[in-house]
Amino acid sequence: MERICPYCMNILSEGTSCPACGKDPEAYRPASHHFPPGTRLHDRYILGRVLGEGGFGITYLGLDTELERRVAVKEYFPTAFVKRETSLTLNVTCYTDAGQVCYEKGRSQFLKEARTMAKLEDIPEIVRVLDFFQANNTAYIVMEFLEGETLKDRTARLGRIPA
C-alpha cells in the first residue's frame, strides 16, 4: 500500500517530508479516539488528519480512492455518549445503556440530515454530500472538500459577522 500524507493526502515518496505540502507525516499524532492516518472506510475512503471536532462529530480529511479526489469525512461521534480506543477497535461504544438510546436516536437524525443535504446539490452555498453510510457502530457523511478559512478563524480575524 502506498504511503499517503495525512496533511494533504498526496502520495509520499521516500524521505521524511511530503513533497507536496512540505510537512513531516510522522509528526502527526492523532488523539486516542481519532482514527490513525491511513484508516480505510467503506472500502473506498482513506482517512488523513482531523480537520475539526465538535460535541457530536469528528471531521477528517480523506481520499476517495474511486474518484481520486480529496473529501471531508464527518463521523457521528457524540462525546457525551460514546468512546473509542483506536488501539483496540475502530468501533464506537456507548458509556451507558441509557446513553445508547440517545445515541441511536442521534445517529438516525445524522443519517436523515445526510439524506436531506444530498438532495441540495444545486445550491452553491452548501457543501455537496457525495456519500453517507454506517460502519463501526456509527455513521459517516462524505462531502466535497473545500479549501478556505474556517468560520472560527474568520471571526477571530474580523470579528462578528453582521446579521
Task: For each feature predicted by the language model, list its residue ranges.
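A short, low-complexity linker immediately N-terminal to eukaryotic Hanks-type protein kinase catalytic domains
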Residues: Y28-L47
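Protein kinase glycine-rich loop
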Residues: L47-G54, T59
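Flexible N-lobe loop architecture of eukaryotic-like protein kinase catalytic domains
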Residues: G52, K112, E121-E125
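Conserved N-lobe loop of protein kinases adjacent to the ATP-binding glycine-rich P-loop
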Residues: L63-V71, F77-V82
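AlphaC helix of the eukaryotic protein kinase fold
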Residues: K83-L120
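Activation-segment/catalytic-loop signature of the eukaryotic protein kinase fold
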Residues: D131-F132
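Conserved short submotifs of the Hanks-type protein kinase catalytic core
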Residues: N136-T150, R154
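Activation segment of protein kinase catalytic domains, centered on the conserved DFG
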Residues: A156-A163
